[in-house]
Amino acid sequence: MILQRLFRFSVIRSAVSVYLRRNIGVTAVAFNKELDPIQKLFVDKIREYKSKRQTSGGPVDAGPEYQQELEKELFKLKQMFGNADMNTFPAFKFEDPKFEVIEKPQA
């Protein structure tokens, strides 16, 4: 009943129909179980990478050189920015400028 009243307005009807058409098109592709072999391999690799990343808790297949380089770069950043926490946004404090009042000589 409420939907019928809403669909009387052409603007709402057209917006909803476009939205539904777009979503139905996306879900039809997403739920298509018939994947070609290349696409299936790609999706399998993405899932494998995701599971590896979750188990390792960081970068996948990163050797000790990568960890050393990462620590070195983070150390450089901490030195450049005064040992600030890199995960938080810096707090800025702006002071209002102080203006001097200059009196105009009267002519």
Curated annotation (Swiss-Prot):
Record PTM N6-acetyllysine, positions in chain: 40, 45, 78, 93, 98, 104
Entry keyword RNA-binding: no
Subunit description: Component of the ATP synthase complex composed at least of ATP5F1A/subunit alpha, ATP5F1B/subunit beta, ATP5MC1/subunit c (homooctomer), MT-ATP6/subunit a, MT-ATP8/subunit 8, ATP5ME/subunit e, ATP5MF/subunit f, ATP5MG/subunit g, ATP5MK/subunit k, ATP5MJ/subunit j, ATP5F1C/subunit gamma, ATP5F1D/subunit delta, ATP5F1E/subunit epsilon, ATP5PF/subunit F6, ATP5PB/subunit b, ATP5PD/subunit d, ATP5PO/subunit OSCP.
Subcellular location: Mitochondrion; Mitochondrion inner membrane
Taxon lineage: Eukaryota, Metazoa, Chordata, Craniata, Vertebrata
Organism of origin: Pongo abelii (Sumatran orangutan)
Summary of the function given for this chain in its UniProt record: Subunit F6, of the mitochondrial membrane ATP synthase complex (F(1)F(0) ATP synthase or Complex V) that produces ATP from ADP in the presence of a proton gradient across the membrane which is generated by electron transport complexes of the respiratory chain. ATP synthase complex consist of a soluble F(1) head domain - the catalytic core - and a membrane F(1) domain - the membrane proton channel. These two domains are linked by a central stalk rotating inside the F(1) region and a stationary peripheral stalk.
Keywords: Acetylation, CF(0), Hydrogen ion transport, Ion transport, Membrane, Mitochondrion, Mitochondrion inner membrane, Transit peptide, Transport
The organism's place on the tree of life at top rank: Eukaryota
Name of the protein in its database record: ATP synthase peripheral stalk subunit F6, mitochondrial
GO MF term (any one): proton transmembrane transporter activity
Family according to the record: Belongs to the eukaryotic ATPase subunit F6 family.
Transit peptide limits: 1-31
UniProt xrefs under InterPro entries: ATP_synth_f6_mt, ATP_synth_f6_sf_mt
Any one Gene Ontology BP term: proton motive force-driven ATP synthesis
Post-translational modification N6-succinyllysine, affected residues: 93, 98
Cellular component GO terms held in the UniProt record: mitochondrial inner membrane; proton-transporting ATP synthase complex
Disulfide bonds: none
